[in-house]
Amino acid sequence: PDTAKGWPDVPNFIMTDNQRMMRWIVDGWVTKMPTFMGKAGLGTMRWMDCSSVSKRPGDLKSRYSETLRGSGVTLEMVWRNMGPPLPVEVTKDNSATKEHEMYSVFLEAASAEVIINGTPLSGAVAERQFFGRTMSTAFLAFSETWVTPQEDI
């Protein structure tokens, strides 16, 4: 997201079957998250239509993958070696947007990769502080729900 270019020059794209909803998510959440705030690539990413999604959950301990296809691109995301389920409740003050509360169940992955048209992207899973503990930056979030606190409505 640091480069002001989009696909196919750099692997900077978003693939969705609901562009209107995804633009709402990007504008209302993603642009407010510290990881993406002010990043040159956020405004230049290419928006592509997704025509199919396949999921391979395996046993959810050793491997999980999702493959998206559309606009001439095949995107595969793979997570491996998951830890135990971790229920998460994040208050507005501790959330990435500082505007919403978030509830989810996370499965932390020890390793992960992103593959575009058969070519793995460079990079590695890192560790950082989440919820008072050191966690991998690669995890699955099941039933992730973002809400606006009642006092803000």
PLM regions with names:
Residues 1-153:
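Targeting-peptide/extracellular-domain and disordered-appendage signature
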